[in-house]
């Protein structure tokens, strides 16, 4: 193990609003089949106003069979409500990590898990299996919440060398299923599996939905499209799964619903960046709808900050999870919009 990348806040090089690059390019030397190479990177987030996204570039050589990444940080719960350190993580491949670059996206788990792996054959839920292309891969750290005195972090990258396994074979869910004729169909468009922060696997989600009397569900894992590649392995022929994503920005969440399998929508922007319309337009161009999720949730970074005129949004969610005061506020707001003809 090489621990040659100890970093602190002074080594964070600003690369634009809400973005920082963590240190210099880290390089792994080529190795023979069967070899394993590991490097560890350390740093710290010491301020609540640290940039939203920190990029750790890793140069991956040829003949790598699998990439494994693990990370650690200190939650430091203050005991004062939603007030503790949370650091998210994800990765992009050499196709790039610029805003909206779906070709480079290879997965995101937020703060839901502490490690992941990617190979040509398989990947941890939340991540995309596929070729381990040589070049610069970029690990993304997202300090979702930082409380004083902050937190140190550690990222460990392991490369396993060897022949690639067989290619991953996608199995998306059918885009339509036989109905029962005119009438009401019952479903839920806002659900999470183990592909983000949910507790249920895809088969468990289908079972729970059937037991609840649902005819369809919307797959809406946070910030990743990975579940859409495998729903077809678990979905009965008479049950509809609608692909989607909960686009989890730092200025509120919105559902991209009705997407073609494999479609990924970026979330690395805030209300002041003037990017929402760009990505809701992308959803509609793909045949989907953009829905403001839990718009009156009071939690920072979840609270809707894109404006209550809902410019660029097709619908709003008025009930999310157990009924609470913010659901009541959403219903009243929705009713006032209907009454005013908005």
Short names for language-model regions:
Residues 1-8, 20-24:
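N-terminal secretory signal peptides
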Residues 29-30:
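N-terminal signal peptide c-region/cleavage motif recognized by signal peptidases
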Residues 33-77, 161, 176-178:
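Solvent-exposed, flexible loop/coil segments flanking beta-strands in beta-rich domains
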Residues 36-48, 75-124:
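Surface-exposed beta-strand/loop patches in noncatalytic accessory domains
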Residues 65-67, 129-145:
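Noncatalytic modules at the cell exterior or secretory-pathway interfaces
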Residues 76-77, 144-149:
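Short acidic/polar inter-strand loop motif in beta-rich domains
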Residues 147-158:
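Edge beta-strands of jelly-roll/beta-sandwich modules across compartments, strongly enriched
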Residues 172-311, 317-340:
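A metal-dependent hydrolase metal-coordination microenvironment
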